[in-house]
Design a protein with these regions (language model features):
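Conserved PLP-binding catalytic core of the aspartate aminotransferase-like
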Residues: 334-369
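N-terminal entrance/gating region of PLP-dependent enzymes' catalytic architecture
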Residues: 1-61, 276, 367-375, 386, ...
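Short loop-beta-helix segment that forms the pyridoxal 5′-phosphate
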Residues: 52-80, 131-134
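Short, glycine-/Ser/Thr-/acidic-enriched flexible segments
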Residues: 111-113, 137-138, 168-170, 199, ...
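Active-site C-terminal subdomain of aminotransferase-like
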Residues: 169, 213-330
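Glycine- and acidic
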Residues: 28-36, 59-65, 100-103, 127-135, ...
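Conserved PLP-enzyme active-site core in the AAT-like
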Residues: 40, 73-249
């Protein structure tokens, strides 16, 4: 098999860290960071958060906290949603629990990542209370169905807690209708959380930025620097409009030796390490944690905002190159039009119409690709059809290996089809 950092590896939405990020990770470990009082790590975390908030197009008034990844980043955002819904009913969910909230409901598309389901269980919202919205013809959350769910639940006395939008699902990279979902959330005063763990970086490609809408209308946003930014795995980020609400949702009572409560760092102190007392340890799940902002800071210092924009555009172009080949080759079938950096296609010889037979053929192609070891996509299911899925997120991906993947699929597919 291929290493995750190989230019032909396109299986996952995570990748090996860049050299600079790995060096930053090592420096973070050696520095033995603490999240309390005047720590250089808190300063670097704060700087990196402010840079990412600006880079991703959020207002300066928004706050952020690093997490261990997308799972925890979504839990933090959903925890804020839970606190918001409870406080509208005069309840402190963090203090008194969920028992007094009548039948909480959360709405998300059927392509929502399972980490949202996990958050429902961890936060006591209940996995059974996640309303999965069917997809429209563009494989996005169906807005009419979303509205119908909300009206049905409100009429029955249930409590809408959050609407969750997908900023690029991990199967096909399709972005939900986020501007319209934000408007629906505002109409009903429901928290709008966006899972952009993989695809949130897509806002940096001006060709698709409009699909993400006005980020000032988001209430919380999860994004993973350990994906497109190529930071070390274990680096997530939650961005939120209300730091005080995060504090009420996640604050703890300090031990006697930490009686001076940590405070959230004001925006104006972001360039001064002496303004940092405790950083953001009351804004999330972790208490002790590494300085995750140091590798992020190092990568951004190395490639800059324009370098990151160029990376996202390049990877999106790679997915479009695969799609163009799939449309041009008689033996290939494009199964999902790329919006971001994921291309889903399959080998389909002329005259082959049986889905079970096509699935077996393409599964065989994938196995042979793994054996040959030059290109390694993954597989997924698109509308009931087995697909070869190439996800371009690795900074080492290049044009040569984009072409090589399609060439290998054609060569192997022809051989296996002839043997069938």
């Amino acid at each position: 098999g291929l290493r995750t950092g190989h230019p032909g590896f396109t299986s996952w939405v995570t990748t090996a860290p860049s050299t600079t990020a790995a060096a930053g990770h090592l420096a973070s470990a050696v520095a033995f960071p603490q999240r309390y009082w005047f720590q250089p790590g808190n300063h670097l975390d704060a700087m990196a958060v402010r840079w990412l908030i600006e880079l991703l197009g959020f207002p300066a008034s928004f706050v952020g906290t690093f997490t261990s990844g997308g799972s925890t980043a979504n839990i933090v955002g959903m925890g804020a949603a839970r606190q918001h819904a409870a406080e509208q009913l005069g309840i402190d969910a963090a203090l008194d629990g969920m028992g007094a909230i009548p039948e909480p409901r959360v709405y998300a598309s059927s392509e929502t990542h399972h980490v949202v389901t996990r958050a429902m269980g961890v936060l006591g919202l209940g996995r059974a209370n996640l309303r999965l919205v069917e997809l429209d013809d563009g494989r996005r959350a169906d807005l009419r169905r979303l509205q119908a769910f909300i009206h049905e639940d409100q009429s029955a006395g249930r409590t809408p807690v959050a609407i969750v939008g997908n900023a690029g699902d991990v199967n096909t990279g399709i972005v939900d209708p986020l501007p319209e979902m934000a408007a629906i959330a505002r109409e009903h005063d429901i928290w709008f959380h966006v899972d952009g763990a993989y695809g949130g970086w897509g806002v940096l490609d001006e060709r698709v930025e409009a699909a993400f809408g006005d980020r000032s209308l988001y209430d919380s946003f999860a994004v993973d620097p350990h994906k497109w930014l190529a930071a070390p795995v274990g680096t997530g980020l939650t961005i939120c409009r209300d730091g005080d609400l995060l504090g009420r949702a996640f604050s703890i009572e300090s031990g006697a030796y930490l009686r001076e409560r940590s405070r959230a760092m004001p925006v104006e102190d972001a360039e001064s390490p002496w303004g940092v007392i405790g950083g953001t340890m009351d804004w999330g799940v972790d208490f002790s944690m590494p300085t995750r902002g140091l590798p992020v800071w190092a990568v951004l210092k190395e490639i800059g905002a324009e370098g990151m924009r160029e990376r996202v555009r390049r990877h999106n172009d790679f997915a479009r190159m695969v799609a163009a080949r799939a449309r041009a080759e008689e033996e290939l079938e494009l199964l999902s039009e790329p919006q971001l950096s994921i291309a889903c296609f399959r080998y389909r010889p002329p005259g082959w119409d049986d889905e079970a037979r096509l699935e077996g053929l393409n599964a065989g192609i994938l196995s042979e690709l793994r054996r040959v070891g030059r290109s390694l996509p993954s597989s997924t299911n698109v509308g009931g059809r087995f697909a070869l899925r190439a996800c371009y997120i690795n900074p080492r991906n290049d044009h040569e290996h984009v072409k090589l993947l399609v060439d290998d699929v054609l060569e192997i597919g022809r051989r296996l089809a002839a043997e069938a």
